[in-house]
C-alpha cells in the first residue's frame, strides 16, 4: 500500500498558512485576507480544541482550500486509526503523523487515508530546539521507515537546513516535503525551498499588522523559486 504524493503545483506560491489562532473569527478573518495568496492551510490543535472540529469544514466551505490537520498523531495503531478516521470525516484533506511510534502506528494511518482517499504527512523531526534532545537522533531511521512504508509526503524543519537536506536525500526527489519554522522560528524561505517543496508560515503572517502584506512579502522574496 502506497500513499499518494501531493503535487507541488497544487500548493499556491509554495506557501502553506499555519493557522494556530485560537479564536474562530480572528482565524477566519486572517485567512480571508490572505486567501488570494494561499490555497492550503495547516490547522492545528489550538484552533480545533478552542472551536471544535467543525472549524475544518467551515474553512473548506468558506475558502475552498486544502486543509492539513496538524495533529501530530502519535499513539498505538488502533487509536491512530480512530483519530485519522475522525479527522478525515471532519473534512481534512491530510493529517500529520509522528513517525517515532513505529511502523505499525504509521501504517494504521496510511490504511485509513487510502480507504478515505486522503493523505498522510510523516513528521520525521520538529523545528524547535528541544527536538535535538531526543527525536533528531532517530530522524534518519524514521525517514527510511517512511520510504519502506511507501509514504510520499513528509514534514521536516526549516530551522536546520542541514537536516532538511539529509531528509531530502533519504526520501528522494519524488516525495513531497513541507517545512515549518520559517519566519518566527528563524527559518529562511529561500534556503528552505532548496530542499522543500513548500514552506509553512504561521506567526509571521497571522500576527502581522497586515497579514496580506506579510504573505505578499514572503512570496516576493521567493519569486525566483516559484513555478512559472
Swiss-Prot record:
EC number from the UniProt entry: 4.1.1.23
A GO term (biological process) for this protein?
'de novo' pyrimidine nucleobase biosynthetic process
NCBIfam families (UniProt xref): PRK13813.1 (NF010386), pyrF (TIGR01740)
What species was this sequence derived from? Answer: Methanothermobacter thermautotrophicus (strain ATCC 29096 / DSM 1053 / JCM 10044 / NBRC 100330 / Delta H) (Methanobacterium thermoautotrophicum)
Spell out the reaction equation it catalyses. orotidine 5'-phosphate + H(+) = UMP + CO2
Q: Which HAMAP family match?
A: OMPdecase_type1_A
**What does the annotation say about its assembly with partners?**
Homodimer.
Fetch the InterPro entries from UniProt. Aldolase_TIM, OMPdecase, OMPdecase_arc, OMPdecase_AS, OMPdeCOase_dom, RibuloseP-bd_barrel
What is the protein name given in its UniProt record?
Orotidine 5'-phosphate decarboxylase
Task: Tell whether Lyase is among the UniProt keywords.
Answer: yes
The family classification in the record reads: Belongs to the OMP decarboxylase family. Type 1 subfamily.
Pfam families found in the cross-reference section: OMPdecase
Q: Name one GO molecular function term.
A: orotidine-5'-phosphate decarboxylase activity
| GO cellular component term, pick one | cytosol
UniProt keyword annotations, A-Z = Decarboxylase, Lyase, Pyrimidine biosynthesis
The metabolic or biological pathway listed in the UniProt record of this protein is:
Pyrimidine metabolism; UMP biosynthesis via de novo pathway; UMP from orotate: step 2/2
Q: In terms of domain of life, where is this protein from?
A: Archaea
Q: Binding of substrate: at which residues?
A: 20, 42, 70-79, 127, 180-190, 202-203
Active site feature: 72
Biological role: Catalyzes the decarboxylation of orotidine 5'-monophosphate (OMP) to uridine 5'-monophosphate (UMP).
